[in-house]
């Protein structure tokens, strides 16, 4: 059977802005295309913390202009980030493969992971997202929206969210089927969107 390779791209590998990301994925695409040329089955995962923070901030700023607008939860911001990072990766990898004469499909799967609803991180969130706020802004976010915030190395305050440990991947069979069918798959961006099981 073919060798399976998981490529994990950290946030520094994706850049801090959209133009930086579009440039950065070209370098990643060359390395990934090398693996495909070596006849490996390739699955790509990636960080999304800066991107989720950017989307979250944009949605918050929009909400300030339009107070009736419902704020997007972190799960939705995470899904948005998986979508646009996957979009850039797909395009860069596909272009690199075609340049090498390889006609291999590339696809992104929006991925959810089952977590324990009592995971410690829900009670002690530590994953920072969004922009740096003043104490006044942070206090307002805590009072109005119930955000958890921490002081960030003396620079100001940041929102913190839970980053629970994944127990299983909901779309795992889809990922397996696509990899076995020969696709290059982008999945589990940001570790996946956390969800938990309920009764019924």
PLM segments and residue spans:
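N-terminal glycine-/serine-/threonine-rich phosphate-binding loop
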Residues: 1-45, 54-64, 73, 177-182
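Short, active-site-adjacent cap segments at secondary-structure transitions
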Residues: 13-15, 49-53, 115-118, 193-195
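Ligand-binding beta-strand-loop-alpha-helix segment within the catalytic cores
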Residues: 62-185
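Short, basic, glycine/proline-bearing loop/turn elements
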Residues: 12-20, 155-162, 196-200
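Active-site-proximal beta-strand/loop segments in catalytic clefts of secreted hydrolases
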Residues: 10, 46-48, 111-113, 189
């Amino acid at each position: 059977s073919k060798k399976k390779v998981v490529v994990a791209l950290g946030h520094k590998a994706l850049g801090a802005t959209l133009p930086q990301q579009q440039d950065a994925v070209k370098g990643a695409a060359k390395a990934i295309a090398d693996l495909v040329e070596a006849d490996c089955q390739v699955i790509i995962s990636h960080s999304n913390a800066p991107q989720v923070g950017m989307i979250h901030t944009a949605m918050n700023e929009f909400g300030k202009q339009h107070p009736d607008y419902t704020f997007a939860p972190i799960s939705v911001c995470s899904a948005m980030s998986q979508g646009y990072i996957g979009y850039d990766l797909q395009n860069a990898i596909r272009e690199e493969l075609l340049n090498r004469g390889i006609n291999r499909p590339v696809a992104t799967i929006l991925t959810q992971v089952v977590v324990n609803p009592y995971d410690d991180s829900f009670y002690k969130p530590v994953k920072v997202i969004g922009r740096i706020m003043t104490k006044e802004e942070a206090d307002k976010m805590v009072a109005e929206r119930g955000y958890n915030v921490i002081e960030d190395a003396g620079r100001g305050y940041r929102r913190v969210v839970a980053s629970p440990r994944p127990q299983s991947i909901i779309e795992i069979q889809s990922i397996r089927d696509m990899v076995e069918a020969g696709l290059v798959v982008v999945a589990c961006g940001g570790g996946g969107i956390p969800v938990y099981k309920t009764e019924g």
